[in-house]
Amino acid sequence: MADAAPQLGKRKRELDVEEAHAASTEEKEAGVGNGTCAPVRLPFSGFRLQKVLRESARDKIIFLHGKVNEASGDGDGEDAVVILEKTPFQVEQVAQLLTGSPELQLQFSNDIYSTYHLFPPRQLNDVKTTVVYPATEKHLQKYLRQDLRLIRETGDDYRNITLPHLESQSLSIQWVYNILDKKAEADRIVFENPDPSDGFVLIPDLKWNQQQLDDLYLIAICHRRGIRSLRDLTPEHLPLLRNILHQGQEAILQRYRMKGDHLRVYLHYLPSYYHLHVHFTALGFEAPGSGVERAHLLAEVIENLECDPRHYQQRTLTFALRADDPLLKLLQEAQQS
């Protein structure tokens, strides 16, 4: 779901509205699952579909733009984005789909092969629903399918073009500070090293429903403010980075029984928000943004800084941007001049 290019706007993380179901004994012992079945309502009334922004049959996901809170249906409502995603199978519950008398529709039968449409019971048929409301034009553009372009950014490009461009944007990260200050999501923190310089909090990413470990996804957010991205890192930050790598892996082992060699630990460049954070995902999970054009393994980042203190100030970095991103045009024009 993450885009190859960062969103420029307010909070970048998606807000989940989900109906979670009871976890198995093994999951509870591993700390998986913290949802509730209490009734909730969407934060708006009505939904008149305006456009399908994007869909993927492979990923079982669709992005919808709609008008909500309309008084008369004449377009005077507000914009909202709703993302519907089929949740992964939970192995311990799969057998329930085939026991008893499941509702079936035969689609095809030939010799030993047959295909059916199976209609699961309610408790096995949840759809993860992410709501962005009210949605701005930037949100609509973020979720709209667009062409991407690879661009190579030198150290000088970053200092002279990318950084001034970012500083000219309204990049609010107040939601990050709310987490660090325990004003929001405090109950979701899995681990914290409170050191103001070399500490961090570890929290489940909202793209992970915490119902299974196959798509485990956590984020480590550093306490120290002012570190925007990979480009800011120097040997001064090595204690922080080592803490995130080793303490983060240990916390995940203790909480979820997943060893470090089953984890992919990396930073994004460009990041989706400009406060240093590190991604922890299950190795077998093809997480959005884990491709070679965006993900930088934390262990290799540490080694690069140990070998060359100015590695990330000088190195040319490759990343993808949307074809209509103003930053892409600025970088292309500079490189053609």
UniProtKB/Swiss-Prot annotation:
A motif (nuclear export sequence (NES)) lies at residues 142-154. The modification N-acetylalanine is found at A2. Changing L148A: Inhibits nuclear export to the cytoplasm. Signal peptide: none annotated. It holds the Pfam family DcpS. Detected in liver, brain, kidney, testis and prostate. Changing E185A: Loss of decapping activity. Changing K207A: Reduces decapping activity. Changing Y113A: Loss of decapping activity. Keywords: Acetylation, Cytoplasm, Disease variant, Hydrolase, Intellectual disability, mRNA processing, mRNA splicing, Nucleus, Phosphoprotein. A motif (nuclear localization signal (NLS)) lies at residues 10-13. Substrate binds at residues 175, 185, 205, 207, 268-279. Transmembrane segments: none annotated. The modification Phosphoserine is found at S24, S101. It catalyses: a 5'-end (N(7)-methyl 5'-triphosphoguanosine)-ribonucleoside in mRNA + H2O = N(7)-methyl-GMP + a 5'-end diphospho-ribonucleoside in mRNA + 2 H(+). It is linked to Al-Raqad syndrome: A syndrome characterized by delayed psychomotor development, moderate to severe intellectual disability, poor or absent speech, microcephaly, congenital hypotonia, and severe growth delay. Belongs to the HIT family. Decapping scavenger enzyme that catalyzes the cleavage of a residual cap structure following the degradation of mRNAs by the 3'->5' exosome-mediated mRNA decay pathway. Hydrolyzes cap analog structures like 7-methylguanosine nucleoside triphosphate (m7GpppG) with up to 10 nucleotide substrates (small capped oligoribonucleotides) and specifically releases 5'-phosphorylated RNA fragments and 7-methylguanosine monophosphate (m7GMP). Cleaves cap analog structures like tri-methyl guanosine nucleoside triphosphate (m3(2,2,7)GpppG) with very poor efficiency. This is m7GpppX diphosphatase. It comes from Homo sapiens.
